[in-house]
């Protein structure tokens, strides 16, 4: 039951990453102020869904696998904190870029959206990749009966999750998720925006993002399958 729920929320989260994919394309597709405004207005009506699903996804992990949740979210907190910070940055950018008295300027907040669109999916993919490549944590269930030291899981180093980015295969899946988000963002813009000049750019960018996604994703899948065969 819990595996089904977590898988469902994970799939829904990936689907909703079209918002982040659209954010990463803001200056790639939006070559004029008017085009960037159309892109921001298009994704600005949907960003809450991704944020809510991300939080629900974490809650489902807590309910289903509390030891994993406490170890990953507590031990690797720098990685997860950066992910959450980029999503908070997204919320602030959508809300304040057009407000009166905006001292940072609209373009600054648009670059914040780009940061969210690139860093968010990249680190999410890297974090998920650790489920397959492993993480540097220790589990000592003998501490369950120790009142002076009740901690049963702890991170093995002081990097607290940032060490996951030193594994190239974590980055491979991270970039695969990033390009997948950009694919979904392009498809969303094609179906949501009616502009004769912008849509052709979206179609060309769709092909540009599909090729590296297929290469990276297939490479990660093949690598993971080969590792599983070696350990049989």
Where are the predicted features?
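Membrane-interfacial helix termini and the short, flexible loops that connect transmembrane helices
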Residues: 22-36, 65-70, 91-112, 189-202
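Conserved small/polar residues in nucleotide/adenosyl-binding loops
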Residues: 230-232
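Alpha-helical transmembrane segments and their helix-start/interface "positive-inside/aromatic belt" motifs
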Residues: 1-7, 106-124, 201-211
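Hydrophobic core of alpha-helical transmembrane segments in multi-pass integral membrane proteins
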Residues: 210-222
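Membrane-interface helix-loop-helix junctions at boundaries between adjacent transmembrane segments
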Residues: 71-80, 89-177
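Central hydrophobic cores of alpha-helical transmembrane segments in multi-pass inner-membrane proteins
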Residues: 12-25, 60-62, 85-96
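N-terminal signal-anchor module of multipass membrane proteins
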Residues: 1-49, 55-57
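Loop-centered beta-sheet repeat module
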Residues: 153-213
């Amino acid at each position: 039951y819990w595996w089904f729920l977590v898988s469902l929320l994970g799939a829904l989260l990936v689907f909703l990453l079209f918002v982040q994919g659209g954010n990463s394309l803001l200056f790639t597709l939006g070559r004029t102020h008017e085009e960037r405004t159309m892109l921001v207005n298009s994704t600005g009506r949907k960003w809450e869904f991704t944020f809510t699903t991300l939080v629900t996804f974490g809650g489902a992990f807590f309910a289903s696998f509390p030891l994993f949740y406490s170890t990953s979210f507590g031990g690797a907190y720098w990685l997860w904190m950066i992910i959450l910070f980029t999503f908070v940055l997204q919320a602030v950018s959508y809300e304040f870029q057009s407000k009166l008295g905006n001292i940072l300027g609209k373009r600054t907040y648009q670059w914040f959206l780009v940061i969210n669109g690139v860093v968010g999916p990249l680190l999410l993919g890297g974090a998920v990749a650790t489920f397959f490549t492993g993480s540097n944590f220790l589990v000592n269930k003998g501490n369950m009966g120790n009142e002076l030291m009740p901690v049963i899981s702890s991170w093995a180093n002081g990097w607290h999750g940032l060490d996951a980015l030193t594994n190239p295969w974590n980055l491979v899946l991270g970039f695969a998720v990033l390009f997948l988000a950009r694919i979904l963002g392009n498809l969303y813009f094609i179906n949501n925006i009616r502009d004769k000049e912008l849509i052709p750019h979206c179609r060309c960018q769709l092909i540009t993002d599909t090729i590296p996604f297929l290469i990276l994703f297939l490479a990660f899948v093949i690598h993971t399958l080969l590792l599983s065969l070696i350990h049989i």
